[in-house]
Amino acid sequence: MNKETKLQVEAIKNGTVIDHIPAQVGIKVLKLFDMHNSSQRVTIGLNLPSSALGNKDLLKIENVFINEEQASKLALYAPHATVNQIEDYQVVKKLALELPEFVSDVFECPNSNCITHNEPVASNFRVFEKKGDVRLKCKYCEKVFSREIVTER
């Protein structure tokens, strides 16, 4: 693609840009941060061309800045995403994504027999890596699930 035919997504003055989200994951990230209910302008790019990923998703959220805790939750969905905080059209901070040790009240336990489905308790998982794969262990039923299984729900 040359510069004349390349489409660009409009820059934002202030807010957060989440780039390099794997294709088909952008909508999940949007819901994770409840951005779909925001009164702020949200720009969504789905299945955009990417030399590194083939296709990628992109989110730009005006006047909203995600914090380190939110970035660690994002790492479960998109471990290689980049998060840039923008002020006056300039990148002022890049957040490093690191897996959290624990994640609570974000995901539903895939085990249909888990107590979290029938009792008013928040889900709670311990997050760890095993042979390069991210796994989550439910605090209540103690079952271990791959990241993909837990985040697809």
Curated annotation (Swiss-Prot):
GO terms for cellular component: aspartate carbamoyltransferase complex. GO terms for molecular function: metal ion binding. GO terms for biological process: 'de novo' pyrimidine nucleobase biosynthetic process; pyrimidine nucleotide biosynthetic process. Zn(2+) binds at C109, C114, C138, C141. SUPFAM superfamilies: Aspartate carbamoyltransferase, Regulatory-chain, C-terminal domain, Aspartate carbamoyltransferase, Regulatory-chain, N-terminal domain. Gene3D superfamilies: Aspartate carbamoyltransferase regulatory subunit, C-terminal domain, Aspartate carbamoyltransferase regulatory subunit, N-terminal domain. Keywords: Metal-binding, Pyrimidine biosynthesis, Zinc. Its cofactor is Zn(2+). Binds 1 zinc ion per subunit. It comes from the Bacteria. InterPro entries: Asp_carbamoyltransf_reg_N, Asp_carbamoylTrfase_reg, Asp_carbamoyltrfase_reg_C, Asp_carbatrfase_reg_C_sf, Asp_carbatrfase_reg_N_sf. Contains catalytic and regulatory chains. Belongs to the PyrI family. Involved in allosteric regulation of aspartate carbamoyltransferase. This is Aspartate carbamoyltransferase regulatory chain.
